[in-house]
Amino acid sequence: MALSFSRDRTRPLPFAAEIGALGVVFGDIGTSPLYALKQGVLAVGGTNFLGGDVLGLLSLITWSIILSVTVKYVMLVLRADNDGEGGILALVTLLDLHRSALGMRWYLLAAGLLGAAMLIGDGVLTPAMSVLSAIEGLQVISPELEHWVVTLTVLVLLAVFLSQRLGTERIASFFGPIMLMWFGSLGALGVYGILQAPQVLAGLDPRYGIMLMVNHPGLAGVILGACFLAVTGGEALYADLGHFGRPVIARAWLFVAMPALLLNYFGQGAILLVDPNAVRNPFYDLCPDVFDIPLLFLATAATVIASQSIITGVFSLAKQAIELGYLPPMRIRYTSEHNEQHIYVGRLNWLLMIACIAVVLGFEASDRLASAYGIAVAFAMVTTSILFIAQVHRSWGWPAPAVWAMATGLLTIDFAFASANMTKIHDGGWLPLSIAAAIIFVMVSWRRGLEGVVAQQVRFTEPLDSFVARKDRVNDVEAPRTAIFLSRAGAMTPVALSRMADLLKVRFEKAVIVSVWIAARPRVSVEDRVKVTTLNEGFVRVDLRFGYMQQIDVPSVLGPALSARGIDPDAAIYVIGHERIIPPDEVTKIKDVVAHVFAFLARNAERSVDRFGLPRARTVEIGYPVKL
């Protein structure tokens, strides 16, 4: 039975939505003070930095946050919602690409898939980077505990991933208050540091950032790449738009998250001006010794919440890609009876866990992992800007000069960050790029293979109208019950129906042809979900439409429509086709490799009976070969 999800967003307490947003939206960017400024100082020269270098780094971080997060995401991109949902794939569907010229359509689609793959790849690195940076606080408390850092990080990550299948609905209500405590602590520590060296506030002047780049031309890319770590969580603001909406996210950012982050960065900068040796870990050195242990626990909790948000975001992104036909079906379990956003994708969770732990064991320290971190998000931000600019040009009615001015500003910043992160490739940046490349290859292989299967079905089966009108089936054996056939190509006869008629000479008293369509929007209302067409006395065609964020449960949606026409849905059987993919015997071209990858994915994909929620006891699968 389908779960009934409530989307009531009324809140009994003032600012409850904003506090909730702190726990869901700002986990990634909220934990960046653990490592961002430290990596910037190391990029400049470690303990050999000058006071002006610190002010320059603070200037770059400050204006990166203002321009890349506040202006780009909060003021602009968050306005581009698809029925309330955000994220790269939501932006792709919002563009309605079938209206684009063929060449532009593929460019925009490629940008969207690239960005989605980059964000999924980032899901491997972000939990590792965040938790490892938090646990490294042990080294500040006691250098003798250094050898426990990797072990404890792995244990925390194991706990995070193994708990995913249980769902987080019961404890999610604590995420917001914990993150409120975290941001409050960031701000308080920042003020404490600034009071020790108020001159650090000169770093608000953008000229210090420019001078830093001019004084270190050979390190400009490395420095900018390190400063980018302060804004890597910006994409999450858009991805989580559907949870809270733009006004709530904007208020939480402008009045809580951003002030706390800036205060903490400047507090760390002040400590560095007072004690250059604090470069070993300026975040923990900012804290008075008596609060080190509580801060360690709070930082670990914050990074666990940040990791949870990233994992949930990857699950959501994967579900969108599955429903839009870019990833093979995987079993998706809903872990909440009230919120359709709470899902668990088992196979993906295990893959993420193994990859994440492997990253920790391979890099062992956040300083080394920072060399790989950020490049995937930088490219994802570029693709978001490209798609957003296309949407503004197409649908917002802005004059061309305004669009060009905005495009120039956004892309200048994004390409600067992307170019700076390219310097990380040889030090580990190849890892997220390789993960993203593998994901893109899987997406393309699945999509191409799926199109090939549909093309063969269209080629070798007759139009449904023609099949229904045939007179040569009057002597077939009639089964006195209703059969429901699922069709992938709506206007064509389902292969299962065609094979039963041609090979078994069987026809049913009533045949219901059901096509499931995924709309280019996150949700389809109940009244728009079902369309029934009576073809003749023995055939009924039903088109079911779902949004790409909705649970697909065919019996629960189809049942009332059949009952209204005198058909007992509980007495009907479901007949579905199951393709046995046969790839080429020899691999001589790239398309042959794609065919073999698709065949592997198809063998391991979730079966239709599970994906569509069909009753196993009343479902018949008819297999047939499809040679690619």
UniProtKB/Swiss-Prot annotation:
What does UniProt give as GO cellular component? plasma membrane
Signal sequence region: none
Q: Where in the cell does this protein reside?
A: Cell inner membrane
Show the catalytic activity. K(+)(in) + H(+)(in) = K(+)(out) + H(+)(out)
Q: Primary place of residence?
A: membrane
Protein's membrane topology:
Multi-pass membrane protein
Q: Does the record's keyword annotation contain Phosphoprotein?
A: no
**Transmembrane intervals:** 15-35, 49-69, 106-126, 141-161, 174-194, 210-230, 254-274, 295-315, 343-363, 369-389, 398-418, 425-445
InterPro entries from the entry? K+_transporter, K_trans_C, K_trans_N, Kup
**What keywords would UniProt list here?**
Cell inner membrane, Cell membrane, Ion transport, Membrane, Potassium, Potassium transport, Symport, Transmembrane, Transmembrane helix, Transport
Q: Does the keyword Protease apply?
A: no
Q: Which GO terms describe its molecular function?
A: potassium ion transmembrane transporter activity; symporter activity
Question: What's the superkingdom here?
Answer: Bacteria
Q: Which family does it belong to?
A: Belongs to the HAK/KUP transporter (TC 2.A.72) family.
So what does this one do?
Answer: Transport of potassium into the cell. Likely operates as a K(+):H(+) symporter.
PANTHER family, A to Z? LOW AFFINITY POTASSIUM TRANSPORT SYSTEM PROTEIN KUP, OSMOTIC STRESS POTASSIUM TRANSPORTER
What's the name of the protein? Probable potassium transport system protein Kup
The scientific name of the source species is: Xanthobacter autotrophicus (strain ATCC BAA-1158 / Py2)
